[in-house]
Amino acid sequence: MKRNNIKKARMEQSRRPKKNPLKAAGIEKVDYKDINTLRQFISDRHKIRSRRVTGLTPQQQRQVATAVKNAREMALLPFTSR
C-alpha cells in the first residue's frame, strides 16, 4: 500500500459521527428564549458553529441559526465579544 492510502484508511477508521446534543437533551424545536441551549452552538467570538462541529442535522442547524439571530435581535445574545 502506498503511504497516502494508509493515511486515508487510518482517518476513515478514526472518524466517528458526533452525538446530536439536541436529541440527547430531548429538544425537538429550538426556542430563541432558551439562551443556555443556544450558547452551546456559539463560539467564544459569538459566531454560530458549523454542523460539522456541533453534530446537528441540517434542519436543526437552520433552526439554531434562526433562533440565534432572533435572540441577537431581542438583545438576549450579544452580536460580538468585547
Swiss-Prot record:
Q: Where is this region: Disordered?
A: 1-23
Q: What is this protein called?
A: Small ribosomal subunit protein bS18
Say which species the protein is native to: Corynebacterium diphtheriae (strain ATCC 700971 / NCTC 13129 / Biotype gravis)
What highest taxon heads this organism's lineage? Bacteria
| One Pfam family recorded for the sequence | Ribosomal_S18
Cited NCBIfam families = S18
The record's InterPro entries line, in alphabetical order, gives: Ribosomal_bS18 (IPR001648), Ribosomal_bS18_CS (IPR018275), Ribosomal_bS18_sf (IPR036870)
Q: What keywords does the record list, in alphabetical order?
A: Ribonucleoprotein, Ribosomal protein, RNA-binding, rRNA-binding
GO terms for MF:
small ribosomal subunit rRNA binding; structural constituent of ribosome
